[in-house]
Amino acid sequence: MIIAGERDVDLAVALGALAERGYARVLAEGGPTLNGQLAAAGLLDELCLTLSPLLAGGDAKRILAGPALAPEHGWRLHSLCEQDGFLFLRYRPR
């Protein structure tokens, strides 16, 4: 068991504890809230996006929720794959 915060999870503490246990890679498939918290804490080292050729309506949220982030040095496209019109993009920080 990892305790990483009193009430809310301190993501930096949690990831540090995982690293101490030998888990150097963590895949976070969270929603906008978790993604926003990771980005705000500077804990993202890769961003994978999928673009679909299908249109859907509704009230979809952005991929990051929370306060606005200051633009940093940006991200660079690391790889791009296409299959059946879907684009799979992998970005890494500059």
Predicted regions and their residues:
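Enzymes that bind and transform nitrogen-containing heteroaromatic metabolites
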Residues: 1-94
